[in-house]
Curated annotation (Swiss-Prot):
UniProt lineage: Bacteria, Pseudomonadati, Pseudomonadota, Alphaproteobacteria, Rhodobacterales
Gene field: hisB
Protein name (record): Imidazoleglycerol-phosphate dehydratase
Source species of the chain: Ruegeria pomeroyi (strain ATCC 700808 / DSM 15171 / DSS-3)
Pathway(s) of this molecule: Amino-acid biosynthesis; L-histidine biosynthesis; L-histidine from 5-phospho-alpha-D-ribose 1-diphosphate: step 6/9
Protein's UniProt keywords contain Heme: no
Family: Belongs to the imidazoleglycerol-phosphate dehydratase family.
Length: 195
């Protein structure tokens, strides 16, 4: 069973994450940050990872700690659910169009975290959500998930469309990477013998 539950509590936030890598994309994400919940819902639905996230944060300051700490906890949950990564495809990629926007994602569940982020969100906010937090989420998620993650915006004029295309592209790439590869059996997908 490729599932994990992570709880993270600090003076700034209280986060709980439950995921099932072999799900159907069911979700119940309640972080208190509306646009972010919408993006997490996209991540779950398009990766087919069942995801339940509950978060409480220091909203009186801003949404930064809530978004970043959710990325940390979700990355930790992904890493825990993958275990030693036997039999997974490991790599995933997607070109995702959404109206004016197109975002490309390539990722490797290598255990070597690195984020390449070439995304330009033209507005500072989407509603009340600070657009710079999109990168902050993916930085935390990739670091704590052990993911080499490249996200490149190829086109886009509307910040909402660009951000949503990024989340969906990562989701579709993640869906490929976490899938079990029947040709690999229980082999670790590396010549090193470990990831």
């Amino acid at each position: 069973m490729r599932r994990a539950s992570i709880s993270r509590q600090t003076a700034e936030t209280e986060i709980s994450v439950d995921i099932n890598l072999d799900g159907t994309g069911a979700y119940d994400n309640q972080t208190g940050v509306g646009f972010f919940d919408h993006m997490l819902d996209q991540l779950a639905r398009h990766s087919l990872i069942d995801m339940t996230i509950s978060a409480k944060g220091d909203y009186h300051i801003d949404d930064h700690h809530t978004v970043e700490d959710t990325g940390i906890a979700l990355g930790q949950a992904l890493s825990a659910a993958l275990g030693d990564k036997r039999g997974i495809r490991r790599y995933g990629e997607c070109h995702l169009p959404m109206d004016d926007a197109q975002v490309r994602c390539a990722l490797d569940l290598s255990g070597r975290p690195f984020l390449v982020w070439n995304v330009d969100l033209p507005t500072a906010k989407i509603g009340t959500f600070d657009t710079e937090l999109v990168r902050e989420f993916f930085q935390a998620f990739s670091t704590h998930g052990g993911i080499t993650l490249h996200v490149d915006q190829l086109h886009g004029l509307n910040s909402h469309h660009i951000a949503e295309a990024a989340f969906k592209a990562v989701a579709r790439a993640l869906r490929q990477a976490v899938e079990s590869d029947p040709r690999k059996g229980d082999a670790i997908p590396s010549t090193k013998g470990t990831l």
